[in-house]
């Protein structure tokens, strides 16, 4: 069965970057959210499932 983990804002965070035609890079850091990981599916499908849910209002630039 999948396990759900919370993003711990004091130890971890999720980020992404947007490149603007090489002129600048915007970086976004999400401060909260959850991650769901199914270890059994990883073993069965040689990759598994990974899902992240992040509140779009919970980010800092």
UniProtKB/Swiss-Prot annotation:
Pfam families noted in UniProt: YceI
Induction behaviour: By the herbicide dichlorprop [(R)-2-(2,4-dichlorophenoxy)propionate].
Gene3D superfamilies (alphabetical): Lipid/polyisoprenoid-binding, YceI-like (2.40.128.110)
Domain of life: Bacteria
Family, per entry: Belongs to the UPF0312 family.
Further information: On the 2D-gel the determined pI of this protein is: 6.99, its MW is: 20.9 kDa.
Name of the protein this chain belongs to: UPF0312 protein
